[in-house]
Amino acid sequence: QERVRPCLFMNKVDRCILEMQMEPEDMFMRFRKSMEDVNVIIATYNDELLGDIQVAPEKGTVAFGSGLHGWGFNVERFAKIYASKMGVDKDKMMKRLWGDNFFNAKKKTWTNVMQPEGCTEPLQRAFCQFIMGPIAQLMRAIMNEDKPKYEKMMTTLGIVLKGDDRQLLGKPLMKRTMQIWID
């Protein structure tokens, strides 16, 4: 009756990375399956006045994060960052950061094929390469107390800890770092 457009929050991303030790591609597959399941339910309540209300990361209607640790992001957050770095439109980048889109860093080209002709190794999915990979690397480096690695990543990402935050270790450091970077 209220005609509210749905959005979806994929919670417990931290658990996928730290407890379940999932690789970015496995997380992508799990997220995609969950979205498909949600969209099947949404389709049963189709309202012609609202139009297409299915949730999709490239439409900005899906967010990922950790409710427990107080951080979350949508694809648009990263699309803004990479669009400015690569000199492309943010909306175009949003579409590239989800689905079967792969970036060939050697050729600096985009493709929708995981292993195009001439590539000896399969390419990483853009969502995994540009979003989940860096998040997983940073979180794991912090939790494994690999200070040189996480400090280098934090510097590269522009994450600056202030005051008492500089004394944090382990989960509190991971939580604070993600809040600063992602939010």
What is the meaning of each model-derived region?
Residues 1-183:
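Structural and coupling elements of P-loop NTPases
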